[in-house]
Amino acid sequence: MKKSKITFLIAELFLVVIAGFFIHQIFREDVPQKRVAVILSNSGDKRWDGLINGLKQSANVNDVHLIICNTDDIESAQDEKELIDEQLENDVDAFIICPAPGEDTSDMLGQLGDVPFVLITQDAYSEDGASGFVTIKPDNYKIGYTLGEQIRANDADGLRGKSIGIITGYSQTEGSVSGKAGLMDAIEGTGCEVSWVYSRCGNPNICDIVDILGKVDYMVVMDTY
């Protein structure tokens, strides 16, 4: 799966570069130092290291005061709203946000009004399609599709008669929905069976969950646990 690792590394590098460009563009005027709050679910997770380091470097170059909010898992729009409100009380000028799961998140973010913000890693979830917010993200559908293509190509029988288990992040997120859709399209018509799909709920012991769900020929994990 070396190619898939490269795909994810390229996606992470893309996020770092574009998020840095956002900081440069939004505050390029000659004004006093601005404050930007970064809200990421479980901000201490190592998966954010590259992104945070890139943002810090860009903030330093552009004389921006970057605030990395200390967070646990953000499971709802209300969780995220509390973090946003706290930073607004601290007079931040803009936000970089990984949107919370759930269909209420888009409406909550819309209430920010004139406060600048950009979404990263995924769009806000909506059954109607794109939210319309400024979003910096990889092509989550294509990532899922590429994973499906690789599994199919590496299986001697082209997946015919094989079983697959899918593990995603929270169900009501654009990243999970798009990634799963891409995977399903890639394996369509192969004759394989999707035995189960598990979406994150809280902070489970994923090994115990997998033991309960049962054995499959291939397991596709589309989020960090």
What does each model-found stretch correspond to?
Residues 52, 56, 80-84, 88, ...:
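Extracytoplasmic/secreted envelope proteins and their assembly/folding machinery
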Residues 96-117, 183, 199-225:
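Hydrophobic alpha-helical
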